Swiss-Prot record:
Belongs to the class-II aminoacyl-tRNA synthetase family. Editing domain AlaX-M subfamily. The gene is alaXM. Binds 1 zinc ion per subunit. This is Alanyl-tRNA editing protein AlaX-M. Its cofactor is Zn(2+). Gene3D superfamilies: 2.40.30.130, Threonyl-trna Synthetase, Chain A, domain 2. SUPFAM superfamilies: ThrRS/AlaRS common domain, Translation proteins. Functions in trans to edit the amino acid moiety from mischarged charged tRNA(Ala). One of its GO terms (cellular component) is cytoplasm. It is found in: Cytoplasm.
Length: 245
């Protein structure tokens, strides 16, 4: 099984790895990776793999999880790369940092604003989708008072400027279910194969089960702006927000 490097270090930009297998000359599984695979509403990382033997470069255009494997879809960058990667090759992975860091800001911001909506409005978060320019949060809320969301934005931005530390933990599934009441329900939805749960804690604010990439403190978000609110029928609502740069 691939060692997941971003679970405890989201700021790792480069890493060394060994190719374990290659499918159709372009789907590469490594023994360890810092590339984030698309999941949980967060798009995948991109970047490149550089073969140690000859410096041949391969662009990583997409990363996904298939049948338990983290698969890196590659395309050759130069002539040497046309030979392709094979099992046993040693490579250096390089993350597209601008893209990764933008998603980190978006993801931690999503936890902040979602927590505010839950606490202040009593909403139940039902989904999210991150983007580079804007992200969305879906939630269930019967009394949909749009005017209150300006206040929720202010509360979220106050949390952001307070520079709350963000901590990452890997705990056993049993520990998560026993000690954290909120995770008891969430963990029941996990595959039985999952023995460890990755937790993301914003100190003094919230702790969630989440596999995404996050910042070290809320201050790095800088700020958010709620762009649009939508009524999706019955009690289903949607909110779009952007980052302040």
């Amino acid at each position: 099984m691939t060692e997941v490097l971003y679970f405890l270090d989201c700021y790792l930009r480069e890493f060394e790895a060994i190719v374990e297998k290659v499918t159709d000359d372009k789907y590469v599984v490594l023994d360890r990776t810092a590339f984030y695979p698309e999941s949980g509403g967060q798009p995948s990382d991109t970047g490149k793999l550089v073969r140690e033997e000859d410096g041949a470069e391969f662009e990583v255009v997409y990363v996904g999880k298939f049948n338990g494997d983290i698969s890196h879809e590659i395309t050759p960058v130069d002539g040497n790369a046309a030979l392709g990667l094979k099992a046993g090759d040693r490579v250096r992975g390089i993350i597209d940092w601008d893209r990764r860091y933008r998603h980190m800001r978006m993801h931690t911001a999503t936890h902040v604003i979602a927590n505010v909506i839950e606490k202040e409005a009593g909403a139940q978060i039902t989904g999210n989708q991150l983007g580079l320019d804007k992200s969305r949060v879906d939630f269930s809320l019967e009394a949909f008072d749009r005017d209150k969301f300006a206040e929720y934005e202010k509360i979220a931005n106050k949390v952001i400027t307070e520079n709350h530390p963000v901590n990452l933990y890997l705990v056993s599934r049993k520990e998560a279910e026993e000690k954290l009441s909120r995770l008891t329900t969430l963990a029941k939805g996990f595959s039985e194969e999952i023995s460890e749960v990755r937790l993301v804690e914003i100190e003094g604010i919230t702790i969630e089960a989440c596999g995404g990439t996050h910042l070290k403190n809320t201050g790095e978000i800088k700020g958010i702006k709620i762009e649009k609110l939508q009524n999706k029928g019955k009690s289903n609502r949607r909110m779009y927000f952007t980052l302040l740069d």
